[in-house]
């Protein structure tokens, strides 16, 4: 189990906000830049760093709510972790991180990396809640049983999530299915 969570300085974290609180935040941003099973191009390992960097340009005020939501919920960003090259070990690690965060009554917001991390991310939720619904936005269905010999490929990430009987799926915007995945 991950014993202690180490955080970035607030100005270096998600949104670049200056939270003075000790650890009253309800949201913990988890940068997890896994890049293992991509089949076209690369760079997913830089995703969390680039998302956090871009988030510093976001306007914090919400005109519908008439306040800055981060001030009510609080957000803290974990320091990046060393990610194992072995996909099974990487998935176990992100699962343990999320489990630790949930035990502290916080909500993990994971920034990937490739989306093969999704099954590892949801495991603690499948244990904590009777039913969960996964909302999936992607150009592909990611429902293959395996891809290029890898059961935990980015192309089978959502299929692995559906291995848990208490997970249902809403998938939006994919462009095509394969014959074996069309029954899902």
Model regions: which residues?
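Conserved small/polar residues in nucleotide/adenosyl-binding loops
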Residues: 175-181
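Metal-dependent C-N hydrolase catalytic cores
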Residues: 1-133
């Amino acid at each position: 189990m991950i014993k202690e969570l180490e955080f970035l300085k607030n100005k270096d974290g998600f949104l670049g906000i200056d939270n003075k609180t000790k650890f009253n935040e309800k949201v913990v941003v988890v940068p997890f830049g896994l890049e293992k099973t991509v089949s076209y191009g690369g760079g997913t390992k830089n995703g969390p760093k680039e998302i956090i960097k871009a988030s510093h340009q976001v306007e914090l005020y919400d005109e519908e709510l008439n306040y800055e939501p981060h001030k009510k919920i609080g957000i803290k960003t974990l320091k990046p972790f060393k990610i194992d090259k072995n996909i099974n070990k990487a998935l176990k690690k992100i699962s343990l991180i999320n489990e630790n965060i949930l035990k502290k009554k916080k909500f993990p917001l994971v920034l990937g990396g490739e989306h093969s991390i999704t099954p590892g991310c949801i495991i603690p939720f499948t244990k904590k809640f009777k039913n969960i619904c996964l909302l999936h936005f992607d150009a592909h269905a990611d429902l293959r049983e395996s891809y290029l010999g890898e059961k935990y490929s980015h192309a089978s990430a959502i299929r692995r999530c559906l291995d848990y009987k208490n997970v249902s799926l809403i998938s939006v915007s994919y462009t095509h299915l394969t014959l074996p995945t069309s029954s899902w």
